[in-house]
Amino acid sequence: MYLKSLTLKGFKSFASPTTLRFEPGITAVVGPNGSGKSNVVDALAWVMGEQGAKTLRGSKMEDVIFAGTLSRAPLGRAEVTLIIDNSDNVLPIEYSEVSITRRMFRDGASEYEINGSSCRLMDVQELLSDSGIGREMHVIVGQGKLDQILQSRPEDRRTFIEEAAGILKYRRRKEKALRKLDAMSANLARLTDLTTELRRQLKPLSRQAEVARRAATIQADLRDARLRLAADDLVSRQGQRDAIVEAETMMRRDHDEAAARLAVASEELAAHEAALTELSGRAESVQQIWFGLSTLVERVSATIRIAGERAYHLDVDPATPSDTDPDVLEAEAQQMEVAEQQLLAELAVARTQLEAARAELADRERHAVEADKAHLEAVRAEADRREGLALLAGQVETMRARIESIDDSVARLSERIEEVTARTQQILAEFETVQGRVGELDQSEVHLDEQHERAVAALRFANERVAELQSAERDAERQVVSLRARIDALTMGLERKDGAAWLARNYSDTGLLGSIAKLVKVRPGYEAALAAVLGPAADALAVDSLGAARSALTALKEADAGRATLVLADWLADAGPACVTGLPDGAQRALDLIEAPPWLQGALIAMLYGVVVVNYLAEALGVVDICPQLRVVTVDGDLVGAGWVSGGSGRRLSTLEVTSEIDKAGAELAAAEAHMAQLNAALSGALSEQVAHSDATEQALVALNESDTAILSMYDQLGRLGQEVRAAEAEWESLLAQREELEARRVSILEEVVELETRLHNVEQIQHVHALDENSAAARQLIVAAAEEARGVEVEALLAVRTAEERVNAVCGRANSLRRAAAAEREVRLRDQQAHAARIRAAAVAAAVTDCGQLLASRLTQAVDLAARHRDALATERQQRSVAIAAVRYEVNTLRVRLATLTDSLHRDEVANVQAALRIEQLEQLVLEQFGIAPVDLIAEYGPQVALLPTELEMAEFQQARERGEQVTSPAPMPYDRATQERRAKRAERELAELGRVNPLALEEFAALEERYNFLSTQLEDVKGARKDLLDVVAEVDARILQVFSDAFVDVEREFRGVFTSLFPGGEGRLRLTDPDDMLTTGIEVEARPSGKKVSRLSLLSGGEKSLIAVAMLVAIFKARPSPFYIMDEVEAALDDVNLCRLIGVFEQLRGQSQLIIITHQKPTMEVADTLYGVTMQGDGITAVISQRMRGQQVESLVTSSS
């Protein structure tokens, strides 16, 4: 690895794009002072991640951008690109050439790229850290760096060795773990405080919960007794509804039968066919298609469940229509019409008879009056004459006026009677119209109830499906996380620290073929057995030849990197049988249990020749007795041979076993991830169905509420019309009584008028009565008797007329009412027929939906399986090939079906039996308000027919008696007894009062608090376990740092002695730890004593000597932990020619293993350079560069020309 080129654009004085191409060896950069030589060093440090502006000889980072000159405008950005030759794979990246670019803008924004791809600063630093280039940039020795090394604190000198040894990444890992520990400490303290507080609260709350539990038991007993008493009261008032309850029971039985048929039909569901089309070869597209198909499967399943629910409702028979026959009503209407005509005819005859009777009465009364008054006229004529004509005439006029007033009142009453009659008929017609509308709304209400129940059932199924899928998804996610954690833990276990690991990381010979654990495949279950037989070879590396093995072992020895086991791939061996006959059942050859590449078969035969695998140790001993030359191993890893046995517990898992476990966990992880993706797809479809069903339920509920409001309004209107009818009938009866009273008064006044007119006529005739004729008196008696008889006939005729009028009024309009009732009944029957036909059609459609849904679900399931197989195949091939796969795209014509479900029996019974419900409404309302339970449920659960089951106390006493051996019978249910239930209720009330105040929320609070305490306790244990794991990680990292630093310090100190001797012949120098007991934080002191000098402090040495000592320390680090390249900026400026020659000798030593880039003014340094770069700056302030491959004889001419 070496620096290949450096390109600068707008960096400091390099305004124009400038590329410096480097080669292995020593590259010298020369030029006058201020020409920009050190800017090359700054550019190298900057592009490799330097973040300190002062290190780059600036005050702020923006100073690296070209600031402009008098003739050149400033630039907006600086860009440096470094190309590194990585043909030896020192950098952990699969490229032979690595390009690192850093770009900075005037606004402070920075960009980093590796091989043209954007990355982070951390990525650049981690990439370079593995080659010994860290944050401190010890490979770049700039101006002032030598003084900094000697003047720095011992702890700061330590960082140079740590960076060269690659310890900084371990320190970063340790710092990360410590930060997690700090964050975890606060959580641990918080969890401890919470669990302590919760534990303190649990004890008093448990006592309250026990009291609440006892109170709940007593309250339940009291409620049960009260409910039984209320049920007894309600049953006693529901005698008239027994038939309805019986019908409801029958319909519930039909409902259960329909549900059973639905369950049987649900098992026969399949899916509709779907068409398969070609998919693209991309795994991402296959995944999307699989996800869509899984979503469709979930949606089709939800549709099938909804269709099944609707089919269940279609199996229930509707309510029996009314028994009223419209033809009978029509016949009754015709009979009423005939009766009305007959009554009208009778009324006409009665009126004719009344007129005739009145005429006869008037004639006879006239004769009677004439006869009677003829007798009196003579007697009273004299007296009347005295009274005066004026008085009689006034009385007559007064009477006539009263008669006229009565006639007017009678006429007005007759008109009002007719108006009231007409209004009554109109209200009755409106009443019947509203009643018909109520029937229509009831039918619509039934449909809306069915629709709402369907929506609610579908939503319930959707909610259950979503909850089920969410639970399954959480379980699958936990399984995936667990498997990933297991794979990570096993992978960490594969990080070996032996010679094999060193070879895998650092040895670049092509003869290395890989780890045996990754090249072979063992039959599952036999990993421990094969690992025990192979021994160290289970963790070995495969090489292609004996020569490659020799080279690898030589590299291990030179690097002192530990030991490694190598398996030769070119080994040839014969797999001849070794006593393979007579083996017991279950014994197998080890070679039959392992699969390997053909070129590795020879080595495996050599290692496993004569090895047999059995299940148990006893079998192994038996096989060795039969064939002593065999080696026998059990599946648990116990080895048996002739005269020896090896086994036991506590064996460390081999790489072969760990690799097998990783493969097994990987397969389980792939299956779990596929299952989780399938659950995600199903959950997406289920959530869509849930939202759709929720919206449908809301819409159905709104429509049902609107219908209920309309029905209540109609019932209010019916009540108002009924009140108006009753008020009109009362008014009609009152007006009729007033008219009859006025007519009677008119008859009485008319008789008085006739009498007064007769007296007035007699006075005017002025006749005197001298004698009374006895014969005329007798005739007068006969005439008066005839008049009385005629008056009786007239009264009977008048009564007959009034009776006929009342009968006519009673039947008037009854025929029309019956006809309207017949029409309404026909309309109801027509709607029932239409509903029945609709149910038949809906049943047929439901069957079609079920069949199509089953076929569609089957085809969709096949399509999902096919897509999953394609997806798994693509995942296995790891995108190595792109193939055309067949996928399924299906189209389904959505079936829109209007399904009519069964009418709810309870609702129909309530509507059909309104009058019966009104009689018990008060008691039902009382039960609902006090207990919150429906009357039907109350009777079914607490009615007199329900026996009282034994209490928990009675059963406990029975069990205790049986345990004591007593002869007791099991408590039997007790029949209902009202007196017993009343005593039971009073006893419960008394016990509840004795308990005193009860906290009703204690049970829930205690359960919630206990659950939280258990959860927090579990979390606390998890946090403690995680803290222990982190402490183990810190301890492991400290051990690693201690080992690496100790080895590195020993190597650096050794190299420092040699380099110091080279630079200071006869002198003595060494590196010393300030605190050897604390290798993690100890500093490094530099002790130097040049020849002939005895100094105790480095500050007493000359500037050249201090520079050489600093260079000696850096070179010692370079030799102990070599880096691919080093950059030195005028490190020999303070040296004389002798010391310069010595330093150049050290450079010559470093040239063999690393690339050197030196900024220098010294001619001897230029003479040893393989490549020479000349840097110059003209008056424009812009640096220019020229290069030349140099040898010693060309240096003088180039230096002269460049000056």
Curated annotation (Swiss-Prot):
Coiled-coil positions: 167-203, 250-288, 327-497, 657-689, 720-765, 976-1030
Domain (SMC hinge): residue spans on this chain: 511-622
Keywords in alphabetical order: ATP-binding, Coiled coil, Cytoplasm, DNA-binding, Nucleotide-binding
Top-level taxon in the UniProt lineage: Bacteria
Keyword Cell cycle applies: no
InterPro entries listed in its UniProt record: P-loop_NTPase, RecF/RecN/SMC_N, SMC, SMC_hinge, SMC_hinge_sf, SMC_prok
Subcellular location per the Swiss-Prot or TrEMBL entry: Cytoplasm
BP GO annotations: chromosome condensation; chromosome segregation; DNA replication; sister chromatid cohesion
Main location: cytoplasm
A UniProt-annotated Pfam family: SMC_N
Binding site for ATP: P32, N33, G34, S35, G36, K37, S38, N39
A GO cellular component entry from the record: chromosome
Keyword presence, Coiled coil: yes
General function of this protein: Required for chromosome condensation and partitioning.
Subunit comment: Homodimer.
Domain notes: Contains large globular domains required for ATP hydrolysis at each terminus and a third globular domain forming a flexible SMC hinge near the middle of the molecule. These domains are separated by coiled-coil structures.
Family: Belongs to the SMC family.
Protein known as: Chromosome partition protein Smc
Source organism per UniProt: Mycobacterium leprae (strain TN)
